[in-house]
From Swiss-Prot:
It comes from the Bacteria. The gene is pheT. It comes from Neisseria meningitidis serogroup B (strain ATCC BAA-335 / MC58). Its EC number is 6.1.1.20. Keywords: Aminoacyl-tRNA synthetase, ATP-binding, Cytoplasm, Ligase, Magnesium, Metal-binding, Nucleotide-binding, Protein biosynthesis, RNA-binding, tRNA-binding. Binds 2 magnesium ions per tetramer. GO terms for molecular function: ATP binding; magnesium ion binding; phenylalanine-tRNA ligase activity; tRNA binding. Its main location: cytoplasm. Residues 694-786 form the FDX-ACB domain. Belongs to the phenylalanyl-tRNA synthetase beta subunit family. Type 1 subfamily. This is Phenylalanine--tRNA ligase beta subunit. It holds the Pfam family B5. Tetramer of two alpha and two beta subunits. Its cofactor is Mg(2+). Residues 400-475 form the B5 domain.
Length: 787
């Protein structure tokens, strides 16, 4: 939002310097991006009247002029401007003047003729282009000898504000003046709205066919206007200093009203309309040539203004060329409407262009402003272009309901940390136009029609805080005792998990929760993932249900950078659909190991990590829980090198080697090892129990069993452990043999059994019966003792 300080002062009676106003606005939340004067620095330029013009005797393109610059006599100046003529008033720089760029004016001779100064164009003064080839011609009543900076108010300050989306009420001079009044306590002078005399007979019927999209639409016909009328200099100046180029009087009036009070407007050529105006959704196949000469194909989610023949304009965005006013226009229709922000939002991006109107409508326009805007525009049209105004025609759809919000003074003090008197709070609310009503606890406020962001108590507290001034709230450092919170014995701290993974050689990574849909199909066999309505990009179209895809992508990035050993882990949320259709999110820890077990070094042989290496890492991570590894099939994993991690009969994760088919698809030289576990299961742990260390030596027995290949080592261990008693401290596999001496389809598995008593030294009489029992259990399960 760009505006001039001089225009602001017509509605806010403030005498603050521009620097102080800049600071005040920024501190209140209306960030000032830029503040600069209306013209660059120059001095010594006055208004002069050209009294005579004669051709230069020695130059075809030069003229010798005599001008009255208020010095008491005529000054001779040689001028080459094509539009110089007697009787005009122009800026004149006399000897001693300094123009932009530190260009100093001195008496000189041009082709033998004395020139005591220079007549100036807008370009030479650093002013906006007035579209004239030559001198900048001033109004006839411009006082001769007056400093041009004073006459044109060139020391005026131009502010550019960065208005946040929730403060659409500040996208006008009226809104900013209201804000300045609240911040400084100065008088707020609202623009005077005069009811136009009804002297015309024509009306423009209006029908709202989409009441949820258009809450109000007002039209007024003005007949017999002069479309060729010139926009007054004062209006041109205010528009230009607000960053809007003057086009024509009728268009300029619409833009002026929008900037002045905040209501976007549109002007139709009444003679180009057919029947009633309809505010409706676009229909399939409809197109529109817009004012920017761009023809667009309309979608059915677009609100349009149409007549009986077709679409006239994109509602709230841009008018159509077919119904636009021109120099030949005689009768016009003024339009002022309230469109729901939701129907306008996103249309600028959809059609590839925006406007000042759409910028305001998509943020929210005051829904009680339309009649005032029509009256103000009518007044200006009659004043500048003449004509006869007809009656207003209004159609109404669904308008927002004013919300009531309570403000508790105790809550205000708690949040802001300062006790603001109730009288001051009431004054601030009144200056903001919020019309407070006193209650037992504080105030009740009905959100005004121009404030869409006042919905809850916190919004009112924010308003009080920024107007009171956050810099005025004293620093008050609160003190409090730090209470040590005891962590339950059955839960390990989160940082311990991070430390454990780092100690095992893993590096933490963070990947996107938005992933490629193909990853979900490949690594989770998820044919129906949670899809995003507005994805950032095609490769971020769905929410992940597994961490494996992100870890594989990180591996690819590292391999592309010549890293041949990668150990990474991530703790993050995954997302899935519950049985009731609701979205479920769970936290998981995922890990990936690729390459050698240890970094390459001279003292030992290098080998690549295998399933048992990463299984050991998982066991270490879950060392405080009783877990089993059960062979499984998983879409991401090798069919023979994958296992589910089971605890208390519940699957809490999986571990294994990436499936061979994904190696080729994702261009991986060798298979990485991966795991993924529910984080809640990792953080849970059993109680640590004290166990006395036996002072008696253990006894070891080695048993070799011949068993079918189909029988797993784990099956054998489960049988042996089931037959063991309290003397058995450990049963584990230490060797596997296949080959000569064994029948086909059989293998030999060697198991060590460690026995130890806590009270006595074990004897053969105690050991041998137990070993026999273990052998018997194994034999019954299909494994015989190897002889």
């Amino acid at each position: 939002m760009q505006f001039s300080y001089s225009w602001l002062k017509t509605q806010a009676d403030t005498e603050l310097s521009s620097d102080k106003l800049e600071h005040l606005l920024t501190m209140s939340g209306l960030e000032v991006e830029e503040a600069e004067t209306a013209a660059p620095a120059f001095a010594g330029v006055v208004i002069a009247e050209v009294k005579s013009v004669e051709k230069h005797p020695d130059a075809d393109r030069l003229n010798v002029t005599r001008v009255d610059a208020g010095t008491g006599g005529l000054v001779q100046i040689v001028c080459g401007a094509p539009n110089v003529k007697a009787g005009i008033k122009v800026p004149c720089s006399l000897p001693g003047a300094v123009l932009p760029g530190n260009f100093k004016i001195k008496p000189t001779k041009m082709r033998g003729e004395v020139s005591d100064g220079m007549l100036c164009s807008t370009d030479e003064l650093g002013l906006p282009d007035d579209g004239v080839n030559g001198l900048h011609i001033l109004p006839e009543d411009a006082p001769v000898g007056t400093n041009i900076r004073e006459y044109l108010d060139l020391d005026d300050t131009l502010f550019t504000l960065k208005i946040t989306p929730n403060r659409a009420d500040c996208l006008s001079i009226k809104g900013i003046a209201r804000e300045v009044s609240a911040l400084t306590g100065c008088a707020f002078r609202q623009p005077e709205i005069h009811t136009a005399p009804i002297t015309g007979s024509r009306k423009q019927p209006v029908q709202i066919n989409a009441p949820a999209d258009c809450g109000r639409f007002i039209s007024r016909v003005i007949e017999n206007v002069n479309a060729r009328a010139t926009t007054p200099d004062w209006m041109k100046q205010r528009l230009e200093r607000s960053g809007i180029r003057s086009i024509s009087a009728l268009v300029d009036i619409g833009n002026y009203v929008m900037l002045e009070i905040g209501q976007p407007m549109h002007v139709f050529d009444a003679d180009k309309l057919s029947g009633s105006l309809h505010i409706r959704r676009a229909r399939e196949g409809e197109t529109l040539e817009c004012l920017n000469e761009k023809t667009v194909s309309l979608s059915e989610n677009t609100l349009v203004v149409a007549d009986e023949k077709g679409v006239l304009s994109l509602a709230g965005l841009m008018g159509g060329a077919a119904s636009a006013v021109s120099d030949g226009t005689q009768n016009i229709v003024l339009e002022a409407a309230w469109f729901a922000p939701e129907i306008i939002a996103g249309k600028s991006r959809q059609y590839g262009f925006g406007s000042d109107s759409s910028f305001r409508f998509e943020r929210g326009v005051d829904y009680r402003l339309q009649a005032d805007a029509i009256e103000r525009a009518t007044e200006l049209v009659l004043q500048i272009c003449g004509g006869a105004a007809g009656e207003m025609v209004e159609a109404q759809g669904e308008l927002p309901e004013a919300k009531q919000v309570g403000l508790r003074l105790d809550r205000l003090k708690t949040v802001l940390g300062v006790d603001i008197p109730a009288e001051q709070v009431e004054t601030i609310l009144q200056h903001l136009g919020l019309q407070p009503e006193k209650t037992a606890e504080g105030f009740r406020v009905t959100a005004p029609s121009f404030r869409f962001d006042i919905e809850i108590e916190a919004d009112l507290i924010e308003e009080i805080g920024r107007v009171y001034g956050y810099e005025n709230i004293p620093d008050d450092y609160t003190s409090g005792r730090l209470k040590m919170l005891e962590l339950p014995e059955t839960r390990r701290p989160r940082f311990a998990v991070y430390n454990e993974m780092a100690a095992r050689g893993y590096r933490e990574v963070v990947s996107y929760a938005f992933v490629d849909e193909q990853w979900e199909q490949d690594f989770a066999a998820n044919a129906d993932p949670i899809r995003l309505q507005n994805p950032l990009a095609a490769q971020y179209a769905v929410m992940r249900s597994t961490l494996i895809g992100g870890l594989v992508e990180i591996l690819q990035n590292n391999l592309n950078r010549k890293q041949n050993r990668v150990c990474v882990f991530e703790i993050a949320r995954v997302f899935s659909k519950g049985s009731d259709g609701q979205f479920v999110q769970n936290e998981r820890i995922g890990g990936l190991w690729y390459g050698a077990v240890m970094p390459e070094q001279w003292g030992g042989k290098t080998r690549n990590a295998d399933f048992y290496d990463i299984k050991a890492d998982v066991e270490n991570l879950l060392k405080n829980k009783a877990v089993e590894f059960v062979k499984t099939g998983h879409p991401a994993l090798h069919p023979g090198r994958a296992a589910n991690i089971v605890s208390d009969g519940k699957v809490i994760g999986f571990v294994g080697e990436l499936h061979p088919k994904w190696l080729q698809k994702y261009d991986l030289p060798q298979a990485p090892l991966v795991f993924e576990i529910d984080m809640a299961a990792v953080l849970e742990c059993g109680k640590t129990r004290y166990r006395v260390v036996s002072k008696f030596q253990p006894v070891r027995r080695d048993l070799a069993f011949v068993m079918p290949e189909a029988m797993s080592h784990d099956d054998l261990l489960l049988v042996l452990k089931g037959a063991a008693n309290k003397l058995v401290q450990e049963i584990s596999v230490f060797d596997v043999y296949r080959g000569t001496g064994l029948p086909e389809g059989m293998k030999s598995v060697a198991v060590k059994v460690i026995l130890q008593d806590m009270e006595n030294t074990l004897t053969d009489e105690a050991v041998e019966p137990l070993i026999g029992k273990l052998i018997g259990a194994a034999t019954a399960a299909g494994a015989r003792l190897r002889s």
